[in-house]
Amino acid sequence: MRTILLTVLILTASSTHAADWSQWRGPNGNNVAAAGNNVPTEWSETQDVIWKAKVLGRGHSSPTVIGDLIVLTSADEQGQQQGVFGFDRRTGDQKWGTVVSKGGFPKTHNKNTHASATACSDGRQIYVTFNHHNKVEAAALDLQGKIVWQQDVGGFVPRQYQYGYAASPTLYKNTLIISGDSDTVAWVKALDTRSGRVVWQQNRPQKLNWSSPIVANVAGKEQLLISGCEQIASYDPATGRPLWSQPCLTMATCGTVVWDNDTVYASGGYPKKETVAVKADGSGQILWTNGTKCYEQSMLIHDGHIYAVDDNGIAWCWHAKTGQEKWKQRLQGPVSASPVLVGDTIYASNERGTTFVFKANPQRFEAIARNQLGTESFATPTVVDNVMYLRVASGQGGGRSETLYAIGN
């Protein structure tokens, strides 16, 4: 992402509609595509690719879809610029590019990037977060890529492991909720989407953690949930007031929790390994645990069963209420991206650019296909209107390049 960001043509994007994929893990925060979507199960460079677009820089954020606009964050690591690209959803043409920050890049893990947090949108504005100069900064852009406001949210200075920042922001009504967990300072805050002003804030345990906050309607109320820091924590998303916290898991998790009517499920991490089901009513009841580690990935819940793909590329299915293992199947690792559910079909990409397609069938593992695009895939795909948007990379070092694919019939 070089100075071309400052000169690309700016066009107008349309407003949001019901089919948008407006934030990390989709409009409902569960990585489940809207009902009725029908995405190809097989593709290649020459099959079922509607278009492909070059993405400047490097990033692991997922595509965000707002009407006819696709948004990606990215970073030029050599030039130390972080910014946002807008693409035409119909053609893949780049419509605009905006630099949000320059300089101050921290050290990061080689599997992380300086643009790993996924953008979110309320249909009026786009919201992004970046880590630089020992802080987390949030910015709001209009749908033409013009910056509306920028706000320093809080410090982020990891000490023990300098692996960078990854938590994606989420929206609740007129607030943008952002978390920053490190072993020197840790917080979760809500910002006014119109001004960037802090509406509420809460301190969190000073521990290394990379999970994203998510708002869920569970156990009869709206709850802001974050895993990691050796707990699952719940807050009132309107005020930030702590509702409950349950000791479990381990210090560091990266995945986002999933939930059903009354239970929250999470997995991680480092240094211990655990997958856990916790009642979301504050009772402290842990329904079940096991020793599986889905560290980078978030899980799926569908028809009373949990589906997951762990770091090593093993797919799992558990009964949600009992934790009973229904099956496990080795695919191929390593895996960082999270699986996405389309109807009763799961799509799971590994770090080598292979996407495995299999049924969400609790009775047995039912493989459908495996597809290859590029040589690297860390970003979780998104699905809107029968099209899957997949961010992949090819090459290494100075020859590495990223591509955004639109896959559909």
Which residues are covered by each model-predicted region?
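Positively charged n-region of N-terminal signal peptides that target proteins for export
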Residues: 1-5
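N-terminal signal peptide c-region/cleavage motif recognized by signal peptidases
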Residues: 13-15
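Noncatalytic, solvent-exposed loop/strand surfaces
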Residues: 17-409
